[in-house]
Design a protein with these regions (language model features):
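Well-ordered secondary-structure scaffolds
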Residues: 1-432
């Protein structure tokens, strides 16, 4: 079931999903309006003469103009989108194209123009004027005019949205919002339940005579693990499963992804069940990958610190948003990797993230790229100071202190101005 939900989530976030729905809606709306026109005979006189077309030629003319304009504007919208994607790719990184493509407003506008074009074609096809038969779908033509007016407003909204969306502050804000959402969804609801153990449990290998290595079917990024499927099968067959990877890891075909401990010999079909619980693709996805949005934010900061861009303010904005995330993570209870059944029997050992790993993902690369930018290094120390103050766990404080030490060592080697180094050390005093 979780695998189906993953595929459904991927479909919903695809670029063609909303346009396809709008096109289908346009086809249905066209036939509904044509049916209504067949059932209702409108007398075109008085004030109605200004609202409805009175001849087949005028109806065809209106629909032809609208359909031509809609497909032309659809091409313009597509071109504007490509230009925005090009700018985003060059300034913020190609991996951020996913965020621009999957924005709902882009899909709605493109789908609205294409669906209006298809609607006009269908209605245009049913207009008839012969010696014996005359059918002018006046309501359908009026509805096409209303759609055109709506699409004009959509075009204005779309242009405004594109102009705003390529600004660095907006990009950082959107990534921060996505990061906050992903973190709150995945933590504490991560693989592995909150089962308190004093130390790592010892695998009862003396009771499990057979050990099987589950290997990856293909190379690619691990996008999803159906942990419930693995747990249920392990519990049903009295197995212990240890996962050697987590979503976001890159897998090479044939590499071990899990180990299965069994009392009895297992058939190949049983191992295939485990393989089917792993979904591998060409790119990383945010569904279960907690570091995905963090790496997107880090990529923006890294590009901002590159010699060709040299934009420390964008890097500082990224650091500030990452600080908010790390402060949140310092308060959540990270899940245990050990999952037990109702009888407290170990069934699944997951590969889970911890606070130190998330802290490394957030600040390591930025520190490395910021060696020639004292202002960014100082802001990094200020961020660590905030995280250190925010957390009350000793192991988290030690992880923050380790990063502060690395920043100080970097500054001692790269800072030219002594006052900058003094300023940095003053900010680190709270941590030490």
């Amino acid at each position: 079931m979780k695998k189906l939900l993953f595929f459904w989530s991927e479909i919903k976030t695809s670029f063609w999903f909303i346009p396809s729905l709008l096109i289908l809606s346009a086809v249905i709306a066209a036939w509904v309006m044509i049916f209504i026109d067949h059932q209702i005979d409108i007398e075109i006189e008085g004030i109605f003469s200004f609202m409805f077309t009175s001849s087949a030629d005028s109806a065809r003319s209106v629909l032809s103009i609208i359909s031509g304009a809609m497909i032309g504007v659809a091409g313009t919208v597509f071109s504007i989108t490509l230009v925005a994607l090009t700018l985003a790719s060059s300034n913020f990184g190609s991996r951020l194209i996913r965020n621009f493509m999957y924005e709902k407003i882009n899909q709605i506008v493109l789908g609205a123009y294409i669906s209006s074009f298809i609607y006009c074609l269908i209605v245009l096809n049913v207009i008839k004027e012969t010696d014996t038969t005359v059918f002018i779908p006046s309501l359908s033509v009026l509805f096409a005019i209303i759609l055109t007016i709506i699409n004009i407003f959509l075009l204005v909204i779309f242009i405004h949205h594109i102009a705003v969306s390529i600004q660095s502050d907006k990009v950082v804000s959107d990534i921060a919002e996505s990061l906050s959402h992903n973190v709150k969804v995945l933590f504490p609801e991560e693989m592995g339940e909150d089962f308190e153990v004093e130390k790592e449990p010892t695998l009862p290998t003396e009771y499990y005579n057979f050990t099987y290595n589950v290997k990856s079917n293909k190379s690619g990024y691990l996008q999803y693990i159906d942990d419930n499927k693995i747990f249920d099968f392990a519990n049903k067959n009295n197995l212990i499963v240890k996962l050697d990877c987590r979503p976001g890891d890159y897998l090479v075909q044939g590499v071990n992804i899990a180990r299965v401990f069994s009392k009895d010999e297992l058939e190949d079909s049983s191992l295939n069940i485990f393989k089917s619980a792993f979904i591998t693709g060409k790119s990383r996805t945010p569904q279960q990958d907690a570091e995905f949005a963090i790496h997107q934010m880090v990529e923006i900061a890294a590009r901002a610190l590159s010699p060709g861009v040299n934009d420390p303010y964008t890097a500082i904005a990224c650091i500030d948003n990452l600080t908010t995330t790390m402060c949140y993570l310092s308060k959540v209870k990270f899940p245990s990797p050990y999952r037990y059944n109702d009888n407290k029997e170990l069934r699944l050992i997951a590969s889970v993230l911890d606070f130190e790993g998330m802290l490394n993902a957030a600040f390591n690369q930025i520190r490395q790229f910021a060696k020639d930018s004292p202002s960014v290094v100082i802001r990094l120390m200020e961020s660590l100071k905030v995280v250190y103050y925010y957390t009350d766990k000793d192991e988290y404080k030690m992880a923050v202190k380790m990063h502060a030490e690395m920043i100080l060592r970097l500054a001692e080697k790269t800072f030219i101005e002594k006052n900058d180094l003094i300023d940095l050390k003053q900010r680190s005093e709270f941590i030490y």
